[in-house]
């Protein structure tokens, strides 16, 4: 299994992270519950992190802005069995040796860590989740349930499609108008010469919302790779593969 890590997080010695890369073996990108080869991949992932598949959890992901708290009893969801509740795209926990995972193929994986309260989060943020502030919802849940201070929270964005590659239609302007001002939208929507087309910078939109919520600029790590033009990580826009995904994960150690 080829992978990268979020170095700023792993350097804390509090967590281990992972962002799986593409490989010649197409089965390496199979992670969804019930798909052929998925369980074997999770078993290999577990060996890498020193845990069993019953200590790994991820949500089904339906492009919501909802985040849930997970515990050891949720381990194995969407791996050994379907998830017990639906409608969530992110997870928060303070339990050690519970590996939180999300799947992406251009969307933004959001990693959270409060090194003081030792709380982590793993979030899938596509354009819908970003427009509806899923990152902010994660910060608020960490604050409300675990006493985390936004100024203490470290945030990192894993590989995703970058603002120079993500072309969208003008119909996305309206959804982003609910939580973002017109001036803010100008920072991450850039009009193209083609009629009705824009370049959308999801990492910048996420950064703006997190700064508003009290996360410090120096505690936000931007993506180190574009899934579309770097060719290292799964990209639906590039490959049109309905199965292949990048798995991203974080675990308190």
Model-predicted segments: where are they?
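Active-site microenvironment for binding and transforming phosphate-containing groups
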Residues: 1-253
């Amino acid at each position: 299994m080829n992978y990268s890590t979020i170095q700023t997080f792993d350097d804390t010695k509090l967590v281990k992270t992972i962002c799986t890369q593409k490989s010649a073996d197409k089965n390496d990108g199979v992670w969804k519950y019930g798909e052929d080869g998925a369980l074997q991949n999770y078993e290999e992932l577990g060996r890498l992190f020193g845990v069993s598949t019953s200590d790994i959890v991820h949500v089904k992901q339906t492009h919501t802005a909802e985040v849930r708290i997970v515990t050891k009893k949720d381990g194995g969801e969407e791996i050994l069995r379907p998830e017990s509740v639906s409608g969530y795209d992110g997870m928060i926990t303070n339990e050690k040796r519970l590996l939180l995972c999300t799947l992406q193929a251009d969307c933004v994986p959001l990693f959270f860590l409060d090194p003081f309260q030792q709380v982590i989060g793993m979030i899938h943020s596509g354009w819908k989740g970003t427009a509806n502030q899923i990152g902010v919802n994660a910060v608020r849940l960490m604050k409300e349930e675990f006493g985390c201070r936004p100024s203490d929270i470290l945030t990192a964005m894993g590989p995703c499609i970058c603002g120079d590659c993500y072309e969208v239609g003008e119909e996305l302007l309206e959804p982003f108008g609910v939580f973002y001002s017109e001036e803010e939208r100008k920072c991450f929507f850039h009009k193209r010469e083609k009629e009705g087309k824009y370049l959308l910078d999801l990492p910048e939109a996420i950064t703006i919302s997190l700064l508003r919520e009290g996360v410090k600029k120096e505690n936000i790590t931007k993506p180190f790779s574009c899934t579309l033009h770097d060719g290292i990580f799964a990209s639906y826009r590039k490959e049109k593969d309905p199965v292949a995904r990048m798995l991203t994960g974080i675990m308190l150690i």
